[in-house]
């Protein structure tokens, strides 16, 4: 019913709805109120500022750092590395994996093209192969039917 209302009535209804929800008055918005400062924490309870930012890489992360070419051996990798270094190594390995998959896909397509051309030169096709297979199935079914008929006569 409300979707059928158009024109100035809908605009007026929206205006009234906003006013009732308190959106029209700027005094009640409370968007720019600064938080009240409470008692400040003592310096002993704050965390020390000398902690090294970083990440302790797992064995898998170390392998990715090596595969990406960042380090040559596992012994060269420091105990803590930055998140950016791990992320860059993951991205580089991801891109290498994509390139490898693209290359394998192109190689597989070329192999299929070559095998298809060889099959055409041998006069092979999927239709002929399927027809031969179905003919063999029919022969097997006919043979089983005859064997069942002979067994029934023998009894």
UniProtKB/Swiss-Prot annotation:
Belongs to the UPF0389 family. Keywords: Membrane, Transmembrane, Transmembrane helix. It is found in: Membrane. The gene is fam162b. GO terms for cellular component: membrane; mitochondrion. The chain crosses the membrane at residues 95-114. It is a single-pass membrane protein. This is Protein FAM162B. It comes from the Eukaryota. One of its GO terms (biological process) is neuron apoptotic process.
């Amino acid at each position: 019913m409300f979707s059928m209302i158009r024109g100035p009535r809908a605009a007026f209804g929206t205006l009234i709805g906003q006013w009732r929800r308190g959106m029209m008055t700027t005094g009640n918005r409370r968007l720019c109120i600064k938080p009240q400062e409470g008692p400040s924490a003592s310096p002993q309870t704050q965390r020390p500022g000398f902690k090294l930012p970083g990440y302790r890489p797992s064995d898998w992360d170390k392998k990715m750092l090596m595969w990406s070419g960042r380090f040559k051996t596992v012994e060269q990798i420091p105990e803590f590395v930055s998140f950016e270094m791990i992320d860059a190594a993951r991205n580089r390995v991801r891109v290498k994996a994509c390139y490898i998959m693209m290359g394998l896909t192109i190689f597989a397509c070329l192999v299929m093209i070559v095998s298809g051309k060889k099959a055409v030169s041998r006069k092979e096709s999927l239709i002929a192969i399927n027809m031969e297979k179905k003919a063999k199935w029919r022969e097997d079914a006919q043979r089983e039917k005859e064997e069942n008929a002979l067994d029934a006569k023998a009894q």
